[in-house]
Swiss-Prot record:
It comes from Chlorokybus atmophyticus. Belongs to the universal ribosomal protein uS11 family. GO terms for molecular function: rRNA binding; structural constituent of ribosome. InterPro entries: Ribosomal_uS11, Ribosomal_uS11_bac-type, Ribosomal_uS11_CS, Ribosomal_uS11_sf. This is Small ribosomal subunit protein uS11c.
């Protein structure tokens, strides 16, 4: 008769987190949505790539919408009601991700754009010649 495998470590139960922060990082190639509590501990995350999109489809607004819905659904299951949103990056999924967060049922308290803008820092990549 086989022995039962005992699990080692502490199992995290469902936490009740009423407030949090939704970080949306929208690049040209992908959109990553991370939801944290006020202290900064990650509750849930999702990206266009983890939702099943591949290649150039990861940079589309629909992929960003799907990623945001998946992350928010997991956060609402843990009791989140409202959140701040910080948006970073120049990608096409910025507005769609914010819209998806609102329609998924999460209240928005603050909306911040934290895209890093250089004060003439690094040299940008060369222009494309098509």
């Amino acid at each position: 008769m086989a022995k039962k495998i005992r699990k080692i470590g502490i199992r995290k139960g469902k936490r009740k987190i009423p407030k949090g922060v939704v970080h949306v990082q929208a690049t040209f190639n992908n959109t990553i949505v991370t939801i944290t509590d006020i202290k900064g501990e990650v509750i849930s995350w999702s990206s266009a790539g983890s939702c099943g999109f591949k290649g150039t489809k990861k940079g589309t607004p629909f992929a960003a919408q799907t990623a945001a819905e998946n992350a928010v659904r997991q956060a609402i299951e843990q009791g989140m009601k409202e959140a701040e949103i910080t948006v970073s990056g120049p990608g096409s999924g910025r507005e769609t991700a914010i819209r998806a967060i609102r329609t998924a049922g999460l209240g928005i308290t603050v909306l911040k754009d934290v895209t890093p803008i250089p004060h003439n820092g690094c040299r940008p990549p060369k222009k494309r010649r098509v």
